[in-house]
UniProtKB/Swiss-Prot annotation:
HAMAP family: Ribosomal_eL21. It comes from the Archaea. Belongs to the eukaryotic ribosomal protein eL21 family. This is Large ribosomal subunit protein eL21. Residues 1-22 are annotated as: Disordered.
Length: 100
């Protein structure tokens, strides 16, 4: 028997896939949106940009922008009861529209 690999994108076949109508380049408004520290964002991984994508466990998580590092944003989010820091670009962020 051969041991199966458990790579960085393991078990993400459906999660990191675009629907046929979403294929192609993302809209410019998503990329040009400026986030300020304190803004709430949703981590929505865009599978087109692999190098700056956060781990799949953060897909759909709501976080708060803490600051920037170059072109990337530093996001503070919770994973269970632990506070985590995610560093990613605006390609994988969407402004939070929900309640509190």
């Amino acid at each position: 028997m051969v041991k199966r690999t458990h790579g960085y994108r393991y078990k993400s076949r459906k999660l990191l896939r675009k629907k046929p109508r979403e294929r192609g380049m993302s809209g410019l408004s998503r990329l040009l949106y400026e986030y300020k520290p304190g803004d709430k964002v949703v981590i929505d991984i865009d599978p087109t940009y692999i190098t700056t994508a956060p781990h799949r466990r953060y897909q759909g998580k709501v976080g708060v922008v803490v600051g920037t590092r170059g072109r990337a944003y530093v996001i503070e989010t919770y994973l269970g009861d632990k506070k985590k820091i995610v560093i990613t670009t605006a390609d994988h962020l969407v402004p939070y529209q929900g309640g509190s």
